[in-house]
Amino acid sequence: MKLQRAASQFAAAVLALGVAACSPEADTSKTASTTPAVPVESFLGRWDLTLTSPDKEYPSWLELSQENGQLKAVMVGRWGNARPLPKVEITNGHLKFVSPKEEEGARSDMVFDGTLTGNTLSGTTSAPDGTMWTWTAVKAPGLKESGTPKWGKPIALFNGKDLSGWTMSKSDAKTVWKVEKGNLVTPGGGPELINDQKFQDFKLHVEFKCDPDSNSGVYLRGRYEVQIETDSPNDPPNRRIGSVYGFLAPSPDLPREPGKWQTYDITLIGRIITVMHDGKTIIDNQEIPGITGGALDSGEASPGPIYLQGSEKGHVYFRKIVITPTEPFNQ
């Protein structure tokens, strides 16, 4: 009998606790989330982004800014040039932006959703084929250098004979790079040609000529394209010959001169670039905001190779490619 009474009292106590826990007046302050929303300011700035599909990674770039309380976004997608995005919003620590289907070659817009954890943005996006891909992004490095650069010894990247020291991006390509009469020749619609060495800061001398209606480019650290073309007279100035593609336009605008040998002398320190064309400065000590379309990766803090674009149309010829890297800075 005493055992039954004790059991009844215990059951009543458990029931009372359950009712109290479910009551609107119950004190849940000790277990409620107290994590504050991530402020909008934490999202602002330049981001080096990597988009991951089931079989490939695509380097991309994103810049978020705010003007008069309105968010703005500029993006370099899987290819092409930097472009403003039509929609971007940050709500309760959640980022959403849209890359239009026309820019992505997709059936519908690519909608990016993501959150910020520590110093990393991550999330998902609707892929061109309708599946879901993932993406991550880290703040782009400032790449600010101080002191005076000390130049090392010049290195000839092309020996005038063969492709020694270079690797094509596709080993099974139907059209390939060739050496003809001492010149490197782009395949036209073929693979890229990537140098085997990696460099951080340097001076680069390149001699080239173009067939009519042709297109190529010189990629610095494998990430920043200095454009070469005779096929884009109607493009904006920052996509024509002499430009850092999609970002920096040459001044003055350069004529297209098929069949003529021309030179680039390029100096890249951090993300500050100077470009000379045939001995005349066309881009003077300007900042490259981020990677350009076709970059090998988005890891801007790391050294990277020189690569020559072969995936565009026509034929471009290179006969001299010499790089002079820096030695450690003198403080």
PLM segments and residue spans:
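Bacterial N-terminal signal peptides that target proteins for export
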Residues: 1-11
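C-terminal motif of bacterial Sec signal peptides marking the signal peptidase cleavage site
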Residues: 19-21
